[in-house]
Amino acid sequence: MGQLADKETKQEIVKKDVKKIKKRKRSYMLTLQTITAALLVLLILVGILKLVFYIGGISRIKLSDEGLTHSDRFENCVVVHGIDVSEHQDEIKWKKVKSSGADFVFIRAGYRSAETGELNEDADFRKNIKKAGKAGIMCGAYFFSQALNEAEAVEEAEYLLKLVKRYDIEMPLVIDYELYNGGRLQQKVEAGEMPASSMYHDVVLAFCRRVEKEGYESAVYANYDMLTNYMDSTLLDDEAVIWAAQYGGACDVKGNYRYWQCAEDAAVGGISGNVDHDIWYIEPNRVYSTLAEGKKNAVSVGDCKIEFDADSYKLKNHKAEPEVTVTYDGKKLRQGRHYILSFVKNTESGTGYAIVRGEGKYKDWVAVPFTIN
């Protein structure tokens, strides 16, 4: 009898334990369902926000110079933000890029294979330069070089000139000169066949002079190592604009660089993944020479009168683009024929800048400030 009672007691205990387990399971299921529902609501809200910002072409991500130390030589300059892109960035929403604070872009137009030496067009160049320009972003183009001599540099320049001739180019045409790991240029350097810094200068300047002959402004892109240990960047100052690459918060290049690639992992609205962040230093109202051989006899925009149609401007469709009149010797110049008009820092209240760049029989460029309320 005692054994039977013990057996019944054990059965009751088991039943109670089973009930407790079922109750806990129901509780866990309810908790899981609650969490799942909350996550679903959150995802829907995020999707709605993304849609709103996509439709409006607005990005909440803003390029900034936080954490960067600028050289004292630029104390009178405005810091303008930009990026550089290639086919590796895939599809780009350029309006969002502009609203992120990117006022200019260097777009890869082509490249020489580091293995075969063959010249190639960047798969997304034409699409990118059309859409970036339409979004109000100033465009320049670069060619990834592996030139071993002056003749190859000229070949690359002529290839680039053919690619850009049908587009409005407001920024320099750039030779991107760097040692690609295992590439033909690095192999020649390691073999001791390019021992003198003059050889590097001759190559990049051959490229620059060829594009300048067609009236374009030229530039040389290179990293700190190339500009310091293979070249003398100070020798390039009077020959070409320098676009220096150095990460870590500061640029120590001795040459008078105008552009600085300060990061390779920037987050920019409209681009999935990381992108290079570039800085452009501009001194307002200073007349910059384009160094273009084909424009030696042209009239400088510094000798022209540049006027706005109002004292201040309001944002319209997330940007301000004033009416600008440019005259020379009493004659009104035509935009597109005599000058190219661009705007930077014009997507929020403060001071924006109209950049007037000489075209045709006119040369040089100047950034003129205007007020945005």
Language-model features, listed with the residues they occupy:
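N-terminal Lys/Arg-rich, disordered targeting/topogenic segments
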Residues: 1-30
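Functionally critical loop-and-helix segments that line ligand-binding/catalytic clefts
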Residues: 2-3, 67-91, 236-295
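N-terminal Sec-pathway targeting helices
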Residues: 22-44
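Substrate-binding cleft of extracellular glycoside hydrolase catalytic domains
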Residues: 67, 75-206, 212-214
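Aromatic-lined carbohydrate-recognition surfaces of secreted/lumenal glycan-active proteins
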Residues: 214-229
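Solvent-exposed, low-complexity, repeat-rich "mucin-like" stalks and linkers
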Residues: 295-331
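Serine/threonine-rich, repeat-prone extracellular segments and beta-strand-based repeat modules
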Residues: 332-363
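Interdomain boundary/hinge segments at the C-termini of tandem beta-sandwich modules
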Residues: 370-373
